[in-house]
Amino acid sequence: MLDKHRICISSPPDREKLVAEIFFGDTQWAEINQERDTLEVEFYPRPDGRLWRIDYPVVLRVLEEAKRRLRGE
């Protein structure tokens, strides 16, 4: 399931700093931003209104990878 996730580092116009956008397929489900002193995660709803169901270890791996890329590690 990890290979269906995509992480994009971007510079949206509404942010001062870079963000890590996290997608499952073509649908964004989370974003990590660094606008404050600590990293902050925003979770987005599915377009169809259903709940996201993603295995816990996968979520952790994807978030850690996104954090690593965002920090340039």
Predicted regions and their residues:
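A general, composition-driven signal for non-globular sequence regions
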Residues: H5-I9, Q28, R61
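Surface-exposed loop/turn and secondary-structure junction residues enriched for glycine/proline
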Residues: S10, I32-E35, P57
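A short, structured beta-strand/loop element
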Residues: E16-D48
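Mixed-charge, Lys/Arg-enriched low-complexity segments
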Residues: Y44-E73
